[in-house]
């Protein structure tokens, strides 16, 4: 089962520069945001010589996202200004690193959602109570397991599988000055297999954990509303805000997984427009999700405001 398409690839240099500017802005914002997350969580680790599970997950998540954003920025820059990257071993390395870091991002985010669900949700089932008691001991093993799973499945992209049965001997550069015809055949069975093994497990974990957490928060919020005596209940309002934030996280996560699947499968390689959309969409999730994490965490939010004030003072002194 293969899908074939012939298409022309043209370059519009000003548009290419615009794409690079947008992608670079997203990546720099993401790197700064995740750098703040990493710095805020590293300091107590160094001071106290100990780290909580939540801190460990946030550290791994921020490191993987900084690496991912850096690879996207380098790859986009090379694709515009230098074509030789796509004829060398470095191209294969960049693609494997891209997939590995993206898988790690998906797994770490899913495990963060799972950890919050177990810690926050209120269910009386015996299995859930036992899991709540043991979750702190299980999470380090789950984190290491997710890293090995991500590394294992990213190795499938070492040998020409990232472009999924491209009839041409080399990958094309969508910003090439010379117009040319390319033919791409996408093996649907192979792509679905990779999706099922690499992307689907963390996606299922994240959706299940987030949905159950929203259900638990919603049930507790309704209980507080029935038992409340005043017109306004700050605790209930905080629960409703947590439900909205959790739902927003889930929508961002699903959108990123879908965009990654489409990008990896070459389904829209026949469309220059959709290639551009994916190039812009992929780095937006790590940046946006990290900013939301900062906004919802008092310590991270305080560090973010301090950085903003320092940048503002620096700009005032220079200009």
What is the predicted function of each stretch?
Residues 91-101, 111-143:
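Membrane-interface helix-loop-helix junctions at boundaries between adjacent transmembrane segments
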Residues 24-84, 108-118, 244, 250-252, ...:
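Structural signature of the GPCR N-terminal helical module
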Residues 1-32, 195:
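Extracellular N-terminal segment of 7TM GPCRs
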Residues 108, 134-167:
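Fourth transmembrane helix
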Residues 108, 248-254, 258-265, 271-319:
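Seventh transmembrane helix
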Residues 44-54, 121-138, 211-239, 297-319:
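Intracellular signaling interfaces of 7-transmembrane GPCRs
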Residues 110-111, 196-226:
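Class A (rhodopsin-like) GPCR signature focused on the TM5-ICL3 interface and adjacent 7TM helical core
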Residues 153-159, 179-209:
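Extracellular-loop-to-transmembrane junctions of the mid-late helices
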């Amino acid at each position: 089962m293969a899908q074939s398409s012939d298409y022309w690839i043209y370059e519009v240099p000003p548009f290419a520069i615009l794409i690079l500017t947008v992608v670079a802005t997203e990546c720099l914002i993401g790197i700064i945001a995740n750098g703040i997350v990493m710095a805020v969580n590293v300091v107590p680790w160094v001071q106290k010589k100990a780290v909580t599970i939540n801190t460990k997950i946030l550290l791994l998540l921020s490191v993987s996202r900084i690496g991912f954003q850096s690879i996207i920025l380098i790859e986009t820059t090379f694709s515009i200004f230098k074509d030789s990257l796509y004829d060398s071993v470095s191209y294969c390395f960049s693609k494997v690193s891209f997939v590995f870091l993206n898988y790690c991002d998906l797994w770490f985010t899913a495990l963060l959602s799972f950890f919050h669900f177990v810690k926050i949700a209120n269910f009386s089932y015996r299995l859930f109570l036992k899991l709540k008691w043991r979750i702190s001991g299980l999470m380090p093993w789950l984190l290491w397991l997710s890293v090995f799973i991500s590394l294992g499945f990213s190795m499938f992209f070492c040998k020409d599988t990232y472009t999924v049965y491209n009839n041409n001997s080399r990958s094309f550069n969508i910003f090439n000055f010379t117009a040319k015809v390319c033919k791409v055949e996408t093996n649907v069975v192979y792509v679905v297999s990779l999706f099922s093994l690499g992307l689907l497990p963390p996606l299922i974990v994240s959706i299940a954990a987030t949905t159950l957490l929203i259900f638990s928060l919603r049930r507790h919020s309704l209980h507080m509303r029935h038992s409340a005596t005043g017109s306004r209940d700050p605790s209930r309002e905080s629960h409703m805000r947590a439900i909205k934030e959790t739902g927003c996280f889930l929508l961002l996560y699903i959108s990123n997984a879908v965009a990654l699947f489409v990008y990896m499968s070459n389904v829209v390689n026949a469309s220059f427009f959709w290639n551009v959309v994916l190039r812009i969409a992929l780095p937006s999730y790590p940046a946006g999700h990290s900013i939301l994490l900062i906004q919802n965490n008092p310590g991270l939010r305080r560090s973010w405001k301090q950085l903003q004030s320092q940048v503002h003072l620096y700009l005032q002194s220079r200009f």
